[in-house]
Amino acid sequence: MAQHAVYFPDAFLTQMREAMPSTLSFDDFLAACQRPLRRSIRVNTLKISVTDFLALTAPYGWSLTPVPWCEEGFWIERDDEESLPLGSTAEHLSGLFYIQEASSMLPVAALFAEGNTPERIMDVAAAPGSKTTQIAARMNNQGAILANEFSASRVKVLHANISRCGISNVALTHFDGRVFGAALPETFDAILLDAPCSGEGVVRKDPDALKNWSVESNLDIAATQRELIDSAFHALRPGGTLVYSTCTLNREENESVCLWLKETYPEAVEFLPLGDLFPGAERALTAEGFLHVFPQIYDCEGFFVARLRKTAAIPPLPAPGYKVGKFPFAPMKGREATQITQAANASGLQWGENLHLWQRDKEVWLFPAEIEALIGKVRFSRLGIKLAESHNKGYRWQHEAVIALADPHHANAFELSHQEAEEWYRGRDVYPQTAPSADDVLVTFQHQPIGLAKRIGSRLKNSYPRELVRDGKLFTGND
């Protein structure tokens, strides 16, 4: 694999020499940083099992090497990457996998370690959504996830990835993560804080990542991280699990932040060792039980993961002074709820008791029941999934609901050919050789729902959202 020139400040190299255990070679560290990063994917088990995914993609000649800490994770090598980007393959467009760096699969593995089954989880810094979607898959779309993102421009990307992966148990918020300790005290069974950091671990992906690096900047970032972990710890219920992670390598932003929390709340913080998280984890284990992953250890990005338990309640923060405002939705019950449920079922859309119907004007939504207790305490950007818009003749089912809820084996399902599916993703109407008998058609490809269509004569009218329409080379090259 080709080398690429990485910029290293002298002070950074000095710091790394001091931070690196004597069991590791500094020359190996430098060599690993100069190698381009191996690409990796995570199979979305909400859509397909790992076994079925491997069978489906076997004809493509992809080389898939298992990621040791994530059963659904694989490093991937392909011969046709230049002619067909991984993100344009049929399997990616239909949400069967997520392009995710192997190291970033570690925090969620830690969150669910030792049989942990949290019902209500917060992802404090969620965009672009790799870990939120991984959490949702581990929860099998049950319970609820509050996915927060401070950057307004990244909230849209977060929602797009959640929607593509068929996730229904997420509520989105757009706040500075430091507000949650006061706004939602002792609310969550588990919290992931993948903290904003100096990004020292990503030089294999971005050789210029350290151009603006300085010790002073790292200390400023660490101060923010302490405020974030303090807020997250307040929002965690006693007995709950907090995973703290970064994609950086210095101790100030990693071990020191966790040790500061333990010094601040000595009776309430317990470090949960991660040495048994996966075979070989002990190679990255610190004295405190954290994983400090230098890039040469597993040939991946540099990363840090710590797992903590809150063993006791701590004094609450002052209640926030803001007003959330009137909640614009009302629960949908009785005959109305029965009517839309029956209509949805008839169109191939189904959901369980963990999702509840809510209404705003002509919009009908499904909210995760586990999040309803938070309504009125915090303002949501988006809650659950939009199911439908009602109109005089019935309901207009929404694309995100189809992707999350549709049964691909329903009587109205119609399987497209490779060429027809490519036309669909380009936003064009489809003219199948044999038209379906139903007027409202659940369009599938590889037996995965990819949208709804109206049959008009021999034509299937495309309803694929305009903002998702693709051009350039698509996946017919996989034939």
UniProtKB/Swiss-Prot annotation:
Annotated catalytic residues: 247
EC number: 2.1.1.178
Subcellular location: Cytoplasm
Binding site for S-adenosyl-L-methionine: 125-131, 149, 176, 194
Gene Ontology terms: biological process: rRNA base methylation
Keywords: Cytoplasm, Methyltransferase, RNA-binding, rRNA processing, S-adenosyl-L-methionine, Transferase
Protein name: Ribosomal RNA small subunit methyltransferase F
Keyword Cell wall biogenesis/degradation: no
Cited function: Specifically methylates the cytosine at position 1407 (m5C1407) of 16S rRNA.
Coiled coil start-end: none
Main location: cytoplasm
Organism: Citrobacter koseri (strain ATCC BAA-895 / CDC 4225-83 / SGSC4696)
